[in-house]
């Protein structure tokens, strides 16, 4: 079966993802299980899309972006180079907070520019 989206050979898309027609996933990126990515999206190189993330139609995700569980982006969202989402308040390495993940909603047409952190 041929996909109607493009994934570079160095990237991974886990089972259980829904990827829209015309979407492109470039070098060294990882789209984890349960993600939904809309039509005509562009996922740059070295991007991590954690489990169950939702990206609307025509989203542009630039290089080196980390999108963590709980993030939902509307249509036409632009995520600039090296921006990151933080899905817990006050993260610490010695304390597991997986039960404290926060949902983050980014509305239609929003811009998160270069090196922005959204908590």
What feature does the model see in each segment?
Residues 2-4, 9, 17, 24-119:
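Flexible, glycine/small-residue-enriched loop-and-beta-strand segment within the central core
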């Amino acid at each position: 079966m041929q996909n109607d989206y493009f994934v570079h050979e160095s990237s991974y898309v886990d089972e259980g993802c829904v990827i829209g027609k015309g979407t492109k996933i470039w070098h060294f990126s990882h789209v984890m299980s349960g993600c939904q990515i809309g039509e005509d999206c562009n996922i740059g190189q070295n991007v991590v899309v954690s489990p169950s993330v939702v990206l609307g139609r025509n989203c542009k995700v630039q290089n080196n972006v980390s999108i963590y569980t709980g993030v939902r982006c509307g249509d036409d969202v632009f995520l600039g180079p090296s921006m990151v989402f933080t899905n817990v308040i006050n993260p610490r390495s010695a304390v597991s907070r997986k039960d404290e993940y926060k949902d983050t909603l980014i509305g239609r047409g929003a811009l998160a520019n270069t090196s922005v952190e959204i908590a």
